[in-house]
Swiss-Prot record:
PANTHER family: ACYL-[ACYL-CARRIER-PROTEIN]--UDP-N-ACETYLGLUCOSAMINE O-ACYLTRANSFERASE, ACYL-[ACYL-CARRIER-PROTEIN]--UDP-N-ACETYLGLUCOSAMINE O-ACYLTRANSFERASE, MITOCHONDRIAL-RELATED. This is Acyl-[acyl-carrier-protein]--UDP-N-acetylglucosamine O-acyltransferase. Pathway: Glycolipid biosynthesis; lipid IV(A) biosynthesis; lipid IV(A) from (3R)-3-hydroxytetradecanoyl-[acyl-carrier-protein] and UDP-N-acetyl-alpha-D-glucosamine: step 1/6. GO terms for biological process: lipid A biosynthetic process. Coiled coil: none annotated.
Length: 261
């Protein structure tokens, strides 16, 4: 363990072996820092924050600060990160609220680039990339292996499906289905642009899965059918494709409605 002499570590904080704490960093009460995690200069780890192993918190980042919610009155709520995350300079993650999940959760191997923001009660999966200044409002869910371009802004309670990609500057007010690309494209809010084909191929999705998703996309968004009729048609025509089943289940579970082209 290496703690710079100018760092401030609260006596109740728990630091595992191999943790490095840089100059002027602050680690507040009840924080838990896992093995091999590094905290950069001037970074702040707020109280009730749990970091797993081998995370890299760069200088000036803030993880676990109080939520920007006027209803919050200092109740015990948590921020929890898994392993292998990279939080770049000036990125911010806020803890949960008692009116939400009482915790903000991030999984493993995510990258938050500079000035990106994860608000209270968000759930971020694994392998997510948030480019510079991408912003999640409160209660947002981002599933695994999503890519958010720079300056993306996502409304409260929106869900972004796994393997989706959002182009830079996209404004998102409705759920984005898994496997899709969406951009604002000069419009005020996001529009679907098709499947994230390059991303799916890079991730090793089979030709059969991609073919099934293409067919499902055309039926859902290009056949001018009611959503329930489109889903029924797809289920009768595409059997045994897990990716298509995942897509349909996501759409049926959506609470905010689905972004369309």
């Amino acid at each position: 363990m290496s703690i710079h002499a100018s760092a401030i570590v609260h006596p109740s904080a728990q630091l595992a072996e191999g943790v490095e704490v840089g100059p002027y960093a602050i680690i507040e009460e009840h924080a838990i820092i896992g093995k091999g995690t590094s905290i950069g200069a001037h970074a702040v780890i707020g109280k009730w924050t749990e970091l797993g192993e081998n995370n890299q918190i760069y200088h000036m980042a803030s993880v676990g600060a109080a939520p920007q919610d006027l209803k919050y009155k200092g109740e015990e709520c948590w921020t929890r990160l898994g392993n292998g995350n990279v939080i770049r300079e000036f990125a911010t993650i806020h803890r949960g609220t008692v009116t939400g999940h009482a915790e903000t959760v991030m999984g493993n191997n995510n990258l938050m680039m500079a000035y990106s923001h994860v608000a209270h009660d968000c759930t971020v999966g694994n392998g997510v990339v948030m480019a510079n200044a991408a912003t999640l409002a409160g209660h947002v869910t981002v599933q695994d292996n999503v890519i958010l371009g720079g300056l993306v802004a996502i409304h409260q309670f929106v869900t972004i499906g796994a393997y989706a990609m959002l182009g830079g500057g996209t404004l998102v007010g409705m759920d984005i289905p898994p496997y899709m690309i969406a951009t604002s494209g000069g419009k005020r809010e996001a529009q679907l642009r098709g499947l994230n084909l390059i991303g799916l191929k890079r991730r090793g999705f089979s030709d059969e899965a991609i073919s099934g998703l293409k067919k499902a996309y055309k039926t859902l968004f290009m056949a001018h059918l009611k959503q329930a009729d489109a889903i029924a048609k797809i289920r009768s025509e595409i059997v045994g494709c897990a990716e298509v089943d995942t897509l349909l289940a996501f759409i049926e579970a959506s609470q905010r409605g689905i972004c369309r082209g």
